[in-house]
UniProtKB/Swiss-Prot annotation:
Keywords: Antibiotic resistance, Cell membrane, Membrane, Metal-binding, Transmembrane, Transmembrane helix, Zinc, Zinc-finger. The lineage of its organism: Bacteria, Bacillati, Bacillota, Bacilli, Bacillales. PANTHER family: MEMBRANE-ASSOCIATED PROTEIN TCAA (PTHR40038:SF1). It comes from the Bacteria. The gene is tcaA. Disruption phenotype: Increased in resistance against glycopeptide antibiotics, especially teicoplanin. The resistance phenotype is lowered by several folds in strains carrying mutations in the rsbU gene which codes for a positive regulator of sigma-B. Plays a major role in decreasing resistance to glycopeptide antibiotics. It comes from Staphylococcus aureus (strain NCTC 8325 / PS 47). A zinc finger (C4-type) spans 4-21. Coiled coil: none annotated. This is Membrane-associated protein TcaA. GO terms for cellular component: plasma membrane. Induction: Strongly induced by teicoplanin, vancomycin and oxacillin in strain RN4220, a restriction defective laboratory strain derived from NCTC 8325.
C-alpha cells in the first residue's frame, strides 16, 4: 500500500493514478521502496543469524572473566597470598579464621601470638618464601599431599596440605598449625580459669598430677588466668613457650600473686618432733623446717601459729598476723615457744617418771617371782594380789594357772611408762620361758596407799 501525496488516498503499490484526485504516481519511487523493503528483509535475516553467535561470544567472554575472578581468589597461589597478607598485616582475626579447624578453634589472641612467633622464629621474608615454594611443589606434585614449614630450630610451625579441589580446576590448600598440650602439676588440688578458643575455660587439676589445659598452636604465651585452691583465689598468668619443648607437651610456668611461707621455730628443742604442727589460717599441718607452706593470696592477711608436745602436754606459740602488704613470693617467719616453761615441765615430769619407774621396777620384780611361783606350785594365790580382782586379766591368769598353761617370765625391764590419773601404762621387756626377749604392754591401776595392781596386758 501507498498514500497519494496530494489527497492522502490509500492505493495499491501497482496503481499509477489516484482514483480520488487523479494524481499520477511516480513509478521510480515505487521501485525504490520495493528495493528498500527487500534489503531490510535481507538484513533482518542476516541479523537473526548473527544473534546466536553474538550471545555465544558474550557468554564465552563472561566465562573467561569468571575464570580469572575465581583464579584470583581460589587458586593455590591466591590462597597462599591471603594467608601471607593476613600475617604481614597482623590481621589476627583473619589468621584465626584460616587456621581454625573443626577440632581446634583458634581465637584472635592465639592468632596474634602465632603471628609474632612466626616473625621471631622464622622471619617474615623466609616464611613467605618457604610457604610459596611449598605450595608450588605440592601443586605440581601428583604424589605429595602435605608438607611442613619449620622454624630455624627445626620445629614444625605450619602444615600445608592438598584437600580436594575448588571449582574443579584449582587444588584446595589447607593451612593448619600443629598443636601441643601445655601441662600443669600443682602441689594441691587447683582450679584454673582462663580464655581459650574464644571461650571461657575451666580446668581442675589434682595435687601432684600432670594435667593438660588444652591444645594450643605454636607461640610464646602469657595467658591471663585465675586459680583457686583451698587457700584462696589468685590472679595472674599461665606462661609457656613452644621453644622449650621437643615433645607433644609443654610445661606451664605459673605466675600468680602468691606468697609461700617458710617457718622457723625457736625454743622447741624439748618438743617431740613428730608432734610439731603449724596452723595457718586455722588449717593445721605437720611442721617441717625444709617445707614451704602455701601458696596463699598476697592480697589477704595471714594468721600463723605453731604447737608441739612434751611429755604429752601441748605447748603453743603466740599467733602472729602477717599483713598483706608484707607478703612476698617467699615470706619467712619465726615462731617462738616459751622454752623455760617447757623445760620446767619436762624436768618435773622426768622426776615423776623416774619415781614411777622405780615403783614399777619393784612391782614387776615381785610380780615375776609370784607368777613363776604360781606356775610351779599350780597355786593362783601366789600371784592374785598383783592383779585386780574382777578384771578380765585376773580371770585369765587364774584359768591359766589351773590348766598349767601360765608362762614363766624373768628379768623384767621398764622401757616406758606413763601415768594418767590413777591409770598407768607400762612397756616391759621380759624373757619368756623359751628364752626369748619380748615386749609387753601392761595397764595398771593405782589404788589406796599407792598400791599397784594389773588390769590387762598385750603384746607390743
Amino acid at each position: 500500500m501507498k498514500s497519494c501525496p496530494k489527497c492522502g488516498q490509500q492505493a495499491q503499490d501497482d496503481v499509477q493514478i489516484c482514483t480520488q484526485c487523479g494524481h499520477k504516481f511516480d513509478s521510480r519511487q515505487a521501485l525504490y521502496r520495493k528495493s528498500t523493503d527487500e534489503d531490510i528483509q535481507t538484513n533482518n535475516i542476516k541479523m537473526r543469524k548473527m544473534v546466536p553467535w553474538a550471545i555465544g561470544f558474550f557468554i564465552l567472554i563472561l566465562i573467561i572473566i569468571l575464570f580469572f575472578l575465581l583464579r584470583n581468589f581460589n587458586s593455590p597461589e591466591a590462597q597462599t597470598k591471603i594467608l601471607v597478607n593476613a600475617i604481614e598485616n597482623n590481621d589476627k582475626q583473619k589468621v584465626a579464621t584460616l587456621l581454625s579447624t573443626k577440632d581446634n578453634k583458634v581465637d584472635s589472641e592465639e592468632a596474634k601470638v602465632y603471628i609474632n612467633y612466626i616473625k621471631d622464629e622464622v622471619g617474615l621474608k623466609q616464611f613467605v618464601s618457604d610457604l610459596k615454594n611449598t605450595v608450588h611443589k605440592l601443586n605440581k606434585s601428583k604424589t605429595s599431599v602435605a608438607s611442613y614449614i619449620q622454624t630455624r630450630s627445626g620445629q614444625n610451625i605450619l602444615r600445608v596440605s592438598k584437600n580436594g579441589t575448588r571449582y574443579i580446576f584449582f587444588d584446595n590448600m589447607s593451612f593448619t598449625a600443629p598443636t601441643k598440650q601445655p601441662i600443669v602439676k600443682p602441689k594441691e588440688k587447683t582450679k584454673y580459669e582462663f580464655k581459650s578458643g574464644g571461650k571461657k575455660k575451666m580446668v581442675i587439676a589434682e595435687a601432684n598430677k600432670v594435667t593438660p589445659i588444652g591444645n594450643f598452636i605454636p607461640g610464646t604465651y602469657r595467658i591471663p588466668a585465675m586459680k583457686s585452691t583451698e587457700n584462696g583465689d589468685f590472679a595472674g598468668h599461665l606462661k609457656f613457650d613452644f621453644r622449650q619443648s621437643n615433645s607433644e607437651t609443654v610445661d606451664v610456668t605459673e605466675d600468680f600473686e602468691e606468697a609461700n611461707i617458710s617457718v622457723t621455730l625457736k625454743g622447741d628443742t624439748k618438743l617431740n618432733d613428730s608432734s610439731k604442727k603449724v596452723t595457718i589460717n586455722d588449717h593445721e599441718m605437720a611442721f617441717s623446717s625444709s617445707k614451704t607452706y602455701g601458696p596463699y593470696p598476697q592480697n589477704k592477711d595471714i594468721t600463723i601459729s605453731a604447737s608441739g608436745k612434751a611429755k604429752d602436754k601441748t605447748f603453743t606459740t603466740q599467733t602472729k598476723t602477717i599483713k598483706a602488704s608484707d607478703l612476698k613470693y617467699n615470706t619467712e617467719i619465726t615462731l617462738n615457744f616459751d622454752s623455760e616453761d617447757i623445760e620446767d615441765y619436762v624436768e618435773k615430769k622426768e622426776k615423776e617418771e623416774n619415781s614411777l619407774k622405780n615403783k614399777l621396777i619393784e612391782f614387776f620384780a615381785g610380780y615375776s617371782l609370784a607368777n613363776n611361783a604360781a606356775f610351779n606350785q599350780s597355786d593362783f594365790d601366789f600371784v592374785s594380789s598383783y592383779i585386780k580382782k574382777g578384771s578380765s586379766f585376773y580371770d585369765d591368769v587364774k584359768k591359766r594357772v589351773s590348766k598349767g598353761s601360765l608362762m614363766m617370765i624373768s628379768s623384767p625391764q621398764i622401757i616406758d611408762a606413763e601415768k594418767h590419773g590413777d591409770k598407768i601404762t607400762a612397756t616391759v621387756r621380759l624373757i619368756n620361758e623359751n628364752g626369748k626377749q619380748v615386749d609387753k604392754e601392761y595397764e595398771l591401776e593405782q589404788g589406796s596407799q599407792d598400791r599397784l595392781q594389773l588390769i590387762k596386758t598385750s603384746e607390743k
